[in-house]
């Protein structure tokens, strides 16, 4: 679901499709989302980034459904942050994951 929203965001901004075929890095993103949920702390994990990669993280209170919340994260939070926007739009390779707990949605996107 998050990959489709990022692809839609890229398309609306005139960017070509990103390559999302990175299972191992997607799992690393999921691990980071779980860590943020467990600690209830929005944080970055630079020590786990490989050279040349950048990371965007977000947390948002859960709306009525997961898709609506993820849409707000991509099209509002990430879109309105120059650094996060750059990661989504100007990296050819992206890995991402999200995790929903009872009250929040946590997202990690890594680009290179």
Where are these regions (language model features)?
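Soluble non-cytosolic domains of exported or imported proteins
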Residues: 1-4, 19-27, 64-73, 78-79
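Extracellular disulfide-stabilized recognition modules
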Residues: 1-15, 51-52
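Non-transmembrane alpha-helical segments in soluble domains
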Residues: 6-7, 30, 34, 58, ...
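Surface-exposed patches in mature extracellular/periplasmic domains of secreted proteins
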Residues: 12-28, 40-50, 84-101
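Short, surface-exposed glycine/acidic/tryptophan-bearing loops
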Residues: 25-70
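Disulfide-stabilized extracellular recognition modules
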Residues: 64-112
């Amino acid at each position: 679901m998050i990959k489709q929203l990022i692809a839609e965001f890229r398309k609306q901004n005139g960017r070509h499709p990103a390559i999302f075929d990175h299972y191992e890095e997607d799992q690393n993103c999921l691990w980071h989302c779980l860590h943020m949920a467990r600690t209830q702390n929005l944080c970055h994990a630079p020590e786990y980034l490989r050279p040349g990669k950048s990371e965007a993280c977000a947390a948002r209170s859960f709306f009525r459904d997961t898709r609506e919340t993820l849409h707000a994260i991509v099209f509002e939070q990430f879109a309105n942050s120059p650094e996060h926007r750059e990661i989504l739009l100007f990296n050819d390779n992206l890995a991402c994951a999200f995790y929903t707990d009872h009250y929040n949605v946590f997202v990690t996107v890594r680009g290179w």
